[in-house]
C-alpha cells in the first residue's frame, strides 16, 4: 500500500493542521492514469489502512530526513565541570592526566594517580617559586677581564704640607701666635720666647683678645661600677689616656648662651692644635671673599725638577690651588691641560719624577707639626681630596710609587644601588667635577652646615650667595659645627645613605718603596747643582729635599664588570627544565593548562549568571513570550529548527475542529469522488 502525504498549513508551533491521505489498493496503472490525479482532501484525517481516523489521534508526521551539517559556533564551552575535566584529561599532552579518567572503575588507582599528580604539581610549582625568588633577588656575577693597552696617566697633586703666611693675614696670624705662646706658658709653663713675659700685656686675660680662650677643664671622676657576677663582663681594656685631673679645651655656646659644652682633647698637643686650627679658620674666612686671589708661590720654590717620560715638564702641565691646611698645591696632568700624558711603557723611567723642596721657612709651626710634602693620585675629572686619599713624603728619602689601574663597572637599577652621573642623588654637587661618592658626602655636609648654621665651612666649596663661617658674623658657628660633625660621624645626617656609589669607577692601586736620597757620596754635588739651578741655598741638606717617582708597574689593567646571574633566558630555561622533569611537557602543554583554567573560569561565571537570572529576573509577557515559546524546539529537534523565522505569528483563533465530520466509508476507489471528503462549513 502506498501513501502520499499532502502538507497542509501549520500552526505557529510548527505542527500541521491536518492531512488527507488517499488509499490505493489494487488499482491498475491504466486506471489510475485514466482517473487522473486526485484532488486534495482538505481537513480530513489520515487514513490508516482502509479507515479514516480523526485528526490528532494518529502519530504526528515527521519531517523528511535530510543530511545537513550543523554549524559550529565560534566559541563553545562545556556544559559542566565533569565534561570539561573529562575532555582535558583525554586530550592533554601532560603526562599522567589520562590516568585520572581511564581507571574510573578502579577507585584505588584513580585516587593514587590523583594524589601523585597533585604532589608532582605541587613540587613543580615549589621549584617555580624558588626560581622566581632567585630571579627577583637580582643576583650579579663579577666578571674579571685583563686588558693591555696604552694608559692615560692619572692626575697627581702635590702639596707643601704647611700653609704659607700670606700677606693678607700675616698680622692676624702673628697676633694669634703671640696669644698661643702666652697660653702655652700659662698652661704648661713653656716659654717659647725670651720676650714673652716682658710687659703687663702678657699678664692680661686671654678672654679680652679671643672669644674662645684655651683653658684647663677639670675632669669629673667616673663613678665606680658595681661588680657583676656575670662572667661575660670583663674589665675595660682601654684605659684613659690622660690620667690627670684636668684636660685642655675651649668652651663653645649657642647663640643665646643657653647651651654650652667643652671641646677637649686627651692630649695637650692635640688640644692646642685644634684650638689654633679653629681660630685659623676664622681668620681665613674673614679674608677669603675679600681677597681677589691668593698669591701663588712660584713652582720653582717648591719643585726643583719635574720630568715625565724623560722629558721636562712645562707650565701648561700643572695648575695651582690653595688648601687651608696643606698650603700650596700643584696638580699635574689635570683636565685643563691641552693634552693628557700617555704611558706607553711601564717602569720608573717612563713616569713622573719630581724633586721637591721640603724646607719650612716662614711657615706656621703650630698648625702643621710635620715636615715633607703630601701627594695624592686621582682621575683628571675628580677633585684632589688630600685628607682622604693622600699620604706624606718623607724628607731626604726617594719615594717610588708604582700604580695599577682597575676599572669597576656596576649594574644599576634593580641589580645594585649605584648612580650613573649623580643626577638622581638628592644632593647638589658643589664641586666643579664629575660625581663621586666623596664629592657627594662633602657636598651633603656643606648643605647641612648651611642649613643649620647659616654659613659655609671653609674647607668645602660653597654655593653662590653664602658666606664662610667666622665668629665675627656668626658667633655660634663653632658650637653648631662641632655638633654637626658629631652627627655626621654617626651618620645621623643620612649622607652615607643618600650618596650612592657611582656605577663606573676607575681606581689606582698604589704601592710605595723608599730609599735614602741622595746618598752620602752624591749629596754634595746634587745639592750644589740644585742650589745653582734654582738660585736658592739649601740650609739643611738632608731635611730640605725629597724625591718622588710615580709610574705604572705594568700596562695590564683589570676590568671588574658585573652581569646578571639570572637573566630572563636563564629563567625560562630553568622553568622549562622543571616542567619537563615533573610532567615531561612543553610550552604547548602550558598553553593547554592555561586554556583549561580559562574554561573553568568561564563555566563558573556562566553558572553564576544563570543562577542570578533564574532568581532575580523573569521574561516579559505578550508577543515576546509568544516568540520565546515558538522558538523553543521540541526535545527531539535541534535548536536550529525554529518556526518563528519561517512562519508569521498566529493572530486569529484556530479553526473549530469539532465541526469537521468524519469521512463516510469508501465504496470503491475507482468511483470515489473528491467531493465526498470535502469539508463542511461550520
Curated annotation (Swiss-Prot):
Q: Per UniProt, what is one GO molecular function of this protein?
A: ligand-gated sodium channel activity
One GO CC term on file: plasma membrane
* Reaction catalyzed: Na(+)(in) = Na(+)(out)
Q: Where does the UniProt entry say this protein principally localizes?
A: membrane
Residues of this chain annotated as glycosylated in UniProt: 191, 504
* Any one Gene Ontology BP term: sodium ion homeostasis
Q: How does it sit in the membrane?
A: Multi-pass membrane protein
Report disulfide bridges, numbered on this chain.
Answer: 159-329, 253-260, 306-313, 418-503, 440-480, 440-499, 444-495, 453-480, 453-503, 455-469
List where the protein spans the membrane.
112-132, 587-607
Record's subcellular location: Apical cell membrane; Cell projection, Cilium; Cytoplasmic granule; Cytoplasm
**Which stretches face the Extracellular side?**
133-586
Q: InterPro entries this protein is in?
A: ENaC, ENaC_chordates, ENaC_CS
PTM description: Ubiquitinated. Can be ubiquitinated at multiple sites and undergo monoubiquitination and polyubiquitination. Ubiquitination by NEDD4 or NEDD4L inhibits the ENaC channel through endocytosis, intracellular retention and degradation of its individual subunits. N-glycosylated.
Q: Which stretches of sequence are listed as region Disordered?
A: 34-69, 221-240
- Motif mapping: PY motif: 653-657
> Which keywords describe this protein according to UniProt?
Cell membrane, Cell projection, Cilium, Cytoplasm, Cytoplasmic vesicle, Disulfide bond, Flagellum, Glycoprotein, Ion channel, Ion transport, Membrane, Sodium, Sodium channel, Sodium transport, Transmembrane, Transmembrane helix, Transport, Ubl conjugation
Q: Region (Gating release of inhibition by proteolysis (GRIP)) spans which residues?
A: 201-267
Q: Residues on the Cytoplasmic side?
A: 1-111, 608-682
Looking at the record's lineage, which domain of life comes first? Eukaryota
User: Tell me, how does this one assemble?
Assistant: Heterotrimer; containing an alpha/SCNN1A, a beta/SCNN1B and a gamma/SCNN1G subunit. Interacts with WWP1 (via WW domains). Interacts with WWP2 (via WW domains); inhibits the channel. Interacts with BPIFA1; the interaction is indirect via SCNN1B and inhibits the proteolytic processing of SCNN1A and SCNN1G and the activation of ENaC. Interacts with the full-length immature form of PCSK9 (pro-PCSK9).
Q: What is this protein called?
A: Epithelial sodium channel subunit alpha
Amino acid at each position: 500500500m502506498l501513501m502520499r502525504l499532502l502538507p497542509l498549513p501549520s500552526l505557529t508551533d510548527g505542527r500541521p493542521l491536518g492531512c488527507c491521505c488517499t488509499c490505493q489498493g489494487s488499482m491498475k496503472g491504466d486506471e489510475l492514469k485514466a482517473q487522473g490525479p486526485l484532488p486534495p482532501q482538505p481537513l480530513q484525517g489520515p487514513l490508516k489502512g482502509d479507515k479514516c481516523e480523526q485528526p490528532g489521534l494518529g502519530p504526528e508526521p515527521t519531517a523528511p530526513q535530510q543530511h545537513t551539517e550543523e554549524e559550529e559556533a565560534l566559541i563553545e564551552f562545556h556544559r559542566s565541570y565533569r565534561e570539561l575535566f573529562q575532555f582535558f584529561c583525554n586530550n592533554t599532552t601532560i603526562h599522567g592526566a589520562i590516568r585520572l579518567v581511564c581507571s574510573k572503575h578502579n577507585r584505588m588507582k584513580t585516587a593514587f594517580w590523583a594524589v601523585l599528580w597533585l604532589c608532582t604539581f605541587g613540587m613543580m610549582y615549589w621549584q617555580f617559586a624558588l626560581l622566581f625568588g632567585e630571579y627577583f633577588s637580582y643576583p650579579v656575577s663579577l666578571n674579571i677581564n685583563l686588558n693591555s693597552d696604552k694608559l692615560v696617566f692619572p692626575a697627581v697633586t702635590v702639596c707643601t704640607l704647611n700653609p704659607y703666611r700670606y700677606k693678607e693675614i700675616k698680622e692676624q696670624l702673628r697676633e694669634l701666635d703671640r696669644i698661643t705662646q702666652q697660653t702655652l706658658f700659662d698652661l704648661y709653663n713653656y716659654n717659647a720666647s725670651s720676650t714673652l713675659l716682658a710687659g703687663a700685656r702678657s699678664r692680661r686675660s686671654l678672654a679680652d683678645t679671643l672669644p674662645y680662650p684655651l683653658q684647663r677643664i677639670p675632669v669629673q671622676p667616673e663613678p665606680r661600677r658595681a661588680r657583676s657576677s656575670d662572667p661575660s663582663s670583663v674589665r675595660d681594656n682601654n684605659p684613659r689616656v690622660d690620667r690627670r685631673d684636668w684636660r685642655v679645651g675651649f668652651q663653645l655656646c649657642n647663640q643665646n648662651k643657653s647651651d654650652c659644652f667643652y671641646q677637649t682633647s686627651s692630649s695637650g698637643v692635640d688640644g692646642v692644635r685644634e684650638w689654633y686650627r679653629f681660630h685659623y679658620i676664622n681668620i681665613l674666612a674673614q679674608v677669603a671673599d675679600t681677597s681677589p686671589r691668593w698669591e701663588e708661590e712660584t713652582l720653582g720654590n717648591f719643585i726643583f725638577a719635574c720630568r715625565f717620560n724623560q722629558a721636562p715638564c712645562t707650565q701648561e702641565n700643572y695648575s695651582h690651588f690653595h688648601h687651608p691646611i696643606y698650603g700650596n698645591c700643584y696638580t699635574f696632568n689635570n683636565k685643563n691641560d691641552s693634552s693628557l700624558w700617555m704611558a706607553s711603557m711601564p717602569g720608573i723611567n717612563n713616569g713622573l719624577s719630581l724633586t721637591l723642596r721640603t724646607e719650612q721657612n716662614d711657615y706656621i709651626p703650630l698648625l702643621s707639626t710635620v715636615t715633607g710634602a703630601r701627594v695624592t693620585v686621582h682621575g683628571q675629572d675628580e677633585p684632589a681630596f688630600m685628607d682622604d686619599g693622600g699620604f706624606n713624603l718623607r724628607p731626604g728619602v726617594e719615594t717610588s710609587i708604582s700604580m695599577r689601574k682597575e676599572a669597576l663597572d656596576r649594574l644599576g637599577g634593580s641589580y645594585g644601588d649605584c648612580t650613573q652621573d649623580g643626577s638622581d642623588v638628592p644632593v647638589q654637587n658643589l664641586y666643579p667635577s664629575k660625581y663621586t661618592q666623596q664629592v657627594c658626602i662633602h657636598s651633603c655636609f656643606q648643605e647641612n652646615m648651611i642649613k643649620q648654621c647659616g654659613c659655609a665651612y671653609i674647607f668645602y666649596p660653597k654655593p653662590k650667595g653664602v658666606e664662610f663661617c667666622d665668629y665675627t658674623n656668626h658667633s655660634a658657628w663653632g658650637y653648631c659645627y662641632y655638633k654637626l660633625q658629631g652627627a655626621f660621624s654617626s651618620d645621623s645626617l643620612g649622607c652615607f645613605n643618600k650618596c650612592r656609589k657611582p656605577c663606573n669607577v676607575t681606581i689606582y692601586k698604589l704601592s710605595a718603596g723608599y730609599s735614602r736620597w741622595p746618598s752620602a757620596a752624591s749629596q754634595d754635588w746634587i745639592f750644589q747643582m740644585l742650589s745653582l739651578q734654582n738660585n736658592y741655598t739649601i740650609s739643611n741638606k738632608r731635611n730640605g729635599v725629597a724625591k718622588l717617582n710615580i709610574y705604572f708597574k705594568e700596562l695590564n689593567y683589570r676590568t671588574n664588570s658585573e652581569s646578571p646571574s639570572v637573566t630572563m633566558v636563564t629563567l625560562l630555561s630553568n622553568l622549562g627544565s622543571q616542567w619537563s622533569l615533573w610532567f615531561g611537557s612543553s610550552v604547548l602543554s602550558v598553553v593547554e593548562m592555561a586554556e583549561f583554567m580559562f574554561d573553568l573560569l568561564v563555566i563558573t561565571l556562566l553558572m553564576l549568571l544563570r543562577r542570578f537570572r533564574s532568581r532575580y529576573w523573569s521574561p516579559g509577557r505578550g508577543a515576546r513570550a509568544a516568540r520565546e515559546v515558538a522558538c523553543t524546539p521540541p526535545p527531539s529537534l535541534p535548536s536550529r529548527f525554529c518556526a518563528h523565522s519561517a512562519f508569521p505569528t498566529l493572530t486569529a483563533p484556530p479553526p473549530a475542529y469539532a465541526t469537521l465530520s468524519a469521512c463516510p466509508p469508501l465504496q470503491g476507489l475507482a468511483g470515489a469522488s473528491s467531493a465526498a471528503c470535502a469539508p463542511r462549513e461550520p
